[in-house]
């Protein structure tokens, strides 16, 4: 593996955090390498007067080693006394729990936002508390929120925040379309475009292609930066054996007319040689039969183990990503 790499990863929450942990481990012995994560903010929302940033917080807690691995979100050893009190007062959403430790971050973030501090600067302040080994940048400082238009059997067609659709309804209401409100007027956060331009490797992580990666790419300027960077752009499939690894990406892909398959997602991103975003694409070993078709479409593809079962498998996958990027660069 080449040394002294500037690695940039586009990432969502749980899958992105586990992959980033692997990238950090893969380059740990190379003090000259840097890892930068450009993180989805489309899941963000206002709740009980506080600005909540689920994906940023999940990645922060995971890299800091203080996350709740069993739940996949929140702080380890969390209590929920304040959340219970809020619910007793009828404040917030009873189905969306705010942990007591988590609330500390939300209150600090909201206080700084009300003082006019940009979200990217706030993330720098929050991450300074722990040695993450990864630089986190929100995709934008502007408010962008993902909303879902659903078929509700009780009320008909209506729109709701993504968190309501996912957390309350467990994506059980059929999604008609996804809307990233505010994305057309958003600008990339400070450092985002420079990171992509100066990267040696850019990775589209194994996060939801629609509501995580799709939201990042929808911010004007970011997709163009991926097309124009001199770095190889490689991606990791979030689909294994025709099924999602975690979450609701299958329902999201169906809503935009993309099959839930590793090859379909790779071709959805497209090849840079044809105006798309990717040079290389990794699928799982169970999808090895898809590799020839992917390569026929112009993408360099490999089949490797994709399951992020533990830090070791995450690091092994990260090494495969960097190996593919090196081959694409040649």
Model-found features: residue ranges?
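Extreme N-terminal starter segment of soluble prokaryotic enzymes
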Residues: 2-7
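C-terminal functional extensions of proteins
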Residues: 246-330
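Active-site glycine-rich loop that binds ribose-phosphate moieties when present
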Residues: 176-195
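A short, Lys/Arg-enriched amphipathic alpha-helix followed by its capping loop at the start of a domain
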Residues: 18-33
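Redox- and metal-dependent alpha/beta enzyme cores, enriched for Fe-S-associated oxidoreductases
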Residues: 217-259
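Electropositive, gly/pro-rich neighborhoods at or near active sites that engage anionic ligands
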Residues: 29, 39-180
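Short Gly/Thr/Asp-enriched flexible loops that form oxyanion-binding sites at enzyme active sites
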Residues: 20-24, 212-226, 291-295
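A short helix->loop->beta-strand "cap" motif at the edges of active sites that frequently abuts
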Residues: 31-33, 229-233, 278, 299
């Amino acid at each position: 593996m080449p040394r002294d790499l500037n690695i940039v990863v586009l990432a969502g929450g749980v899958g992105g955090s586990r992959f980033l942990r692997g990238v950090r481990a893969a380059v740990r012995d190379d003090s000259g390498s840097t890892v930068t994560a450009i993180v989805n903010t489309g899941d963000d929302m206002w709740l009980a007067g506080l600005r909540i940033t689920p994906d940023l917080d999940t990645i922060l807690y995971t890299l800091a080693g203080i996350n709740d691995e069993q739940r996949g979100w929140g702080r380890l050893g969390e209590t929920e006394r304040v959340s219970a009190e809020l619910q007793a007062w009828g404040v917030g959403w009873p189905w969306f729990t705010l942990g007591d430790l988590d609330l500390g971050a939300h209150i600090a973030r909201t206080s700084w936002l009300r003082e006019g501090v940009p979200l990217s600067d706030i993330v720098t302040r929050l991450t300074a508390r722990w040695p993450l080994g990864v630089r986190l940048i929100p995709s934008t400082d502007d408010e962008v929120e993902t909303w879902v238009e659903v078929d509700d059997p009780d009320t008909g067609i209506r729109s709701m925040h993504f968190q309501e659709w996912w957390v309350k309804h467990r994506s059980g209401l059929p999604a008609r379309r996804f809307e990233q409100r505010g994305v057309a007027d958003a600008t990339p956060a400070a450092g985002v475009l420079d990171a992509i331009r100066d990267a040696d490797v850019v990775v589209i992580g194994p996060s939801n292609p629609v509501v995580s990666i799709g939201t990042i790419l929808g911010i004007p300027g970011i997709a163009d930066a991926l097309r124009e960077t001199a770095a190889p752009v490689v991606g990791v499939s979030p689909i294994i054996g025709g099924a999602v690894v975690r979450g609701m990406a299958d329902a999201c892909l169906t809503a935009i007319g993309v099959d839930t398959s590793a090859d379909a997602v790779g071709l959805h991103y497209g090849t840079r040689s044809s105006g798309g975003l990717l040079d290389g694409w990794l699928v799982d070993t169970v999808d090895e039969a898809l590799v020839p078709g992917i390569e026929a479409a112009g993408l360099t593809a490999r089949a490797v183990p994709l399951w992020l079962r533990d830090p070791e498998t995450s690091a092994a996958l990260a090494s495969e990503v960097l190996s593919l990027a090196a081959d694409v660069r040649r």
